[in-house]
Amino acid sequence: MSANIYIVEDEEPIITLIKYNLDKEGYKVSYSDNGNDGIKEIKKKLPDLILLDWMLPDISGVEICKNLKKDNRFKDIPIIMLTAKGEEEDKVKGLNSGADDYIT
C-alpha cells in the first residue's frame, strides 16, 4: 500500500512538478491550493505526510502547522515546509512551528 501525501501549495507549476514526481514513484497524492481547503481535506482523511507551503493566500503555512500539531490526531503526521524563505531565522520559525523538515 502506498503512502498518502497531501500538498498544500498555491503555485500551480510547483503542484504539478511535485505531484508528477510523487505519482511516478507510486504515492497517492492529493492537494489544495489554499490553506483553508487544505485543513478541511487533511481533517477528512489523515495523510501519511503533508507538504506545506509557508506563503499561502489565505492563512500562513506556519499557522496551519502550529494548529495541526496541537491536535493529537495530527501530531505524529510528518510535515515538510516548502518555501522560498531561506533565511536562518525563517527556518527556525518553520521548525519551531512543528514542521519536521524545511525545504527551500
Identify what each model region corresponds to.
Residues 2, 46-48, 73-78:
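His-Asp phosphorelay/catalytic-motif detector in bacterial-type signaling
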Residues 9:
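Conserved acidic carboxylate
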Residues 15, 57, 75, 87:
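The feature encodes the CheY-like receiver
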Residues 16-24:
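Charged docking surfaces used in two-component/phosphorelay signaling
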Residues 31-49:
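Acidic, metal-coordinating helix/loop segments flanking the phosphotransfer/catalytic sites
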